[in-house]
Amino acid sequence: MSKLKLNPYFGEYGGMYVPQILVPALKQLETAFVEAQEDDDFKAEFTDLLKNYAGRPTALTLTRNLSPNPMVKIYLKREDLLHGGAHKTNQVLGQALLAKRMGKKEIIAETGAGQHGVATALACALLGLKCKVYMGAKDVARQSPNVFRMRLMGAEVIPVTSGSATLKDACNEAMRDWSGSYEKAHYLLGTAAGPHPFPTIVREFQRIIGEETKKQMLEREGRLPDAVIACVGGGSNAIGMFADFIDEPSVELIGVEPAGKGIDTPMHGAPLKHGKTGIFFGMKAPLMQDREGQIEESYSISAGLDFPSVGPQHAHLNATGRARYESATDDEALEAFQQLARCEGIIPALESAHAIAYAVKMARECTKETILVVNLSGRGDKDIFTVSDILNGKEE
């Protein structure tokens, strides 16, 4: 069997821990990706879709009222303005084009908050591909607007009732389906995790976020930011923001995991800082595990961060100290969700609100002129009912 063309590991993390039946499919995907990256026609079509369909470049907005400290500027990279409502659209268009190039007729995907499912459904509608989306039954209930959007665009949404009925279970079902259908179907993984080559493919198709941010910052401020901040579930929006800054030592990279009800409780989703290394979802990565090594259920108010593991490149950036990973609780994210709406007239996704919460906290503690950029990874329309129910419950 042919050797791999790309390194499947980031330090000790990553790899291709899958049933033997899937190894040829992953190698075929890697070869197709490497060839596509060297094909000017493929790159031109991808760039055209990002610009004329998705609406890139997205704005870099200087907040007027959010920063609690006059010495600190907080910019927002506005992935919420992308068609589909979140950063997910970037890499989904790339993978869907890649699937067509490989002659696949069908797309299988998993989704948590429903944003990846919506992005996959719109890409499949655009490119004429059959679409099947696995979604935890709990997430189907808490993300009904996105479920309707997916079905409206022709996707088949399959609720998953096994396990905790959330994202990890949807991932397992999608992978199981692909094991039996990879000759005709492409598994369009939604985050920078899973078996090689997915973490690399997703990073490269999301890299545009950081590339644009760097260019826009130099135009606006004449210098790079002091820190870029992004929420981390599986980690695709964060790695998209970080990728172009990894080799810029003056820029701090900060990922924000969901602390849920508190890091000192079992109700969180912060495997990077509070997990143990294990094998899950085809990769070696930090995992939320109990003493017996069983995967613990993660928890977050935000469906898109409710994942018990994290992408292998984030694990490596954490291990080497190049990136710093913090956390924000449900309550802090809820406060930031409302604060951004009140201060700037922008309703963020609950996922992105975790990053906003940490940026405001960091700004408060800064003692010198500082520029922070937050990746506003998605808009909050999908979360208004969840937040409304919680706030009404709190008021009663």
Curated annotation (Swiss-Prot):
CDD domains: Trp-synth_B
Group of enzyme by EC: lyase
Modification type N6-(pyridoxal phosphate)lysine: residues: K88
One Pfam family from the record: PALP
EC number: 4.2.1.20
Cofactor: pyridoxal 5'-phosphate
Catalytic activity: (1S,2R)-1-C-(indol-3-yl)glycerol 3-phosphate + L-serine = D-glyceraldehyde 3-phosphate + L-tryptophan + H2O
Assigned GO CC terms: cytoplasm
Pathway annotation: Amino-acid biosynthesis; L-tryptophan biosynthesis; L-tryptophan from chorismate: step 5/5
Keywords, comma-separated and alphabetical: Amino-acid biosynthesis, Aromatic amino acid biosynthesis, Lyase, Pyridoxal phosphate, Tryptophan biosynthesis
InterPro entries for this protein: Trp_synth_b_CS, Trp_synth_beta, Trp_synth_beta/beta-like, TrpB-like_PALP, TrpB-like_PALP_sf
GO molecular function annotations of the record: tryptophan synthase activity
HAMAP family referenced in this protein's UniProt entry, alphabetically: Trp_synth_beta
Known role: The beta subunit is responsible for the synthesis of L-tryptophan from indole and L-serine.
The protein's assembly and partners: Tetramer of two alpha and two beta chains.
Family the UniProt entry places it in: Belongs to the TrpB family.
Entry protein name: Tryptophan synthase beta chain
